[in-house]
């Protein structure tokens, strides 16, 4: 009986460590800077149907800033499609 209890405890510890590792790995990947893109004023970063995605200018602006080439972005609805366009290019020295 003690062996079964010990095995269950080891499985629980392993699963706990695995979950912690996956969470920390996901957080560190989320903080990593994305690949820089060349700056084209008004570039469309993404276009998604509103059935799956609502137009969020805050999310769009964050996505544009994370590319490293823009200072802002706006989300607009065109023909029932949410379109994120990036604006205000950064000067790359």
Swiss-Prot record:
Disulfide topology: 39-89, 55-75, 60-84, 64-86
Annotated compartments: Secreted
Any one biological process term the GO annotation gives: killing of cells of another organism
Gene Ontology CC: extracellular region
Keywords per UniProt: Antimicrobial, Disulfide bond, Fungicide, Plant defense, Secreted, Signal
Phosphoprotein as UniProt keyword: no
UniProt keyword Isomerase, yes or no: no
Signal peptide (residue range): 1-30
Superkingdom of the organism of origin: Eukaryota
Family of this protein: Belongs to the DEFL family.
Name of the protein in its database record: Putative defensin-like protein 190
Source species: Arabidopsis thaliana
């Amino acid at each position: 009986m003690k062996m079964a209890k010990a095995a269950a405890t080891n499985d629980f510890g392993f699963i706990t460590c695995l979950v912690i590792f996956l969470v920390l790995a996901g957080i560190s990947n989320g903080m990593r800077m994305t690949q820089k893109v060349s700056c084209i004023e008004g570039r469309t970063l993404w276009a998604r149907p509103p059935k799956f995605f609502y137009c969020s200018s805050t999310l769009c602006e964050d996505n544009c800033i994370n590319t490293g080439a823009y200072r802002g972005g706006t989300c607009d609805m065109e023909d029932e499609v949410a379109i994120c366009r990036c604006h205000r290019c950064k000067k790359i020295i």
